[in-house]
Amino acid sequence: FADLLRVNLSVLRRIIRTEHLVQDVAQADTEMKTEYAICYCKNRADSAMVIRVRRALAAAKPELLLDSSYFVPWLLPGKARLFTPVSYTERPAVAAAKICEGKIVVLVNGSPSAMVLPALFCENFECLDDYASTAVFSSFLRILKYVSFYLTVFLPGVFVCLAVYLPELIPPQLLYKIEAAEKATPLPLFAEMLLVILILEVIREAGLRMPQSLGHSVSLVSALIIGDAAIATGLMSTPVIFVASITAIAVFVTPSLYEPATLLRLGVVLAAGLAGPVGLAGAFFAVLLSLSGTACLQVPYLAAHPFPQRPIAEDGIIRRNYRRLSAHDFNIWQKREGK
């Protein structure tokens, strides 16, 4: 969405050529009177949810409205949450696909991204390109994304827990190398893991804030130099840097979950380092509780089915071919309310 609001709306209209597409344009209650639009298909979206969204946006009073994300505190009031049950996209084709699923899209004048609500946890592991690939390959990619997310959250904590509290579960040869490396470092294992994770986050943030022509090179060179110097001086061990590097790379497989995954990774390492297996189990249930307690527009974030009337085996972790998927309507509301 690279143009003004009216042009972006016309782009959506050209993709969704149906009289059921509704585009409600309104002005925000701000000094600049910024325009925004609520887009949905009236034969697919739930009318009660549309009314709720319209009222929430009309009651919102942000000081400035530069992006659709400014509406989130009014759409999702209440407690702080790690996972936000809304998603964003800059691709008109993705926004059109979400509208056809029965979702609601919010566009703001001058903003390149559109807000889609409600969002489901499983959708973080899906993308529009999945449907351009074969069913087998896209299913493989989805499995890879799920594995990468759980690796980036739990792998450092599991490593700390096994190395400190349950070393008998580690193969002897690997355990010998870990112990030999840890004897040369002055920090406890979990503190060392936290330090490596924080250093990698600093390097990543520095690379993002620098000019694009230098950012990637600086990040790569910094990681190599700091890692080599840390091992040479005995401040950090090779196994810890290896595990932290795997998690730092795996988090980019699901970029929409980067923020919660980073915070959860730190929390899991702390819990595993301080309380061992009990802390690790507690962290797992805390993550599960956070996910299960999140909802948007009365749609649970952990809804089992992207589209309730379609079996999860057809478009879940494993995807069937698009011809079979097209035999069902793309509507997330239909069976939830017994229609």
Features from the language model and the residues they span:
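Cytosolic regulatory modules rich in charged/polar residues
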Residues: 1-192, 297-328, 332-339
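Flexible domain-boundary/linker segments
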Residues: 29, 70, 74, 112, ...
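Transmembrane alpha-helix detector for multi-pass membrane proteins
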Residues: 148-167, 182-263, 268-273, 280
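Hydrophobic alpha-helical transmembrane segments of membrane transport and translocation systems
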Residues: 238-240, 244-339
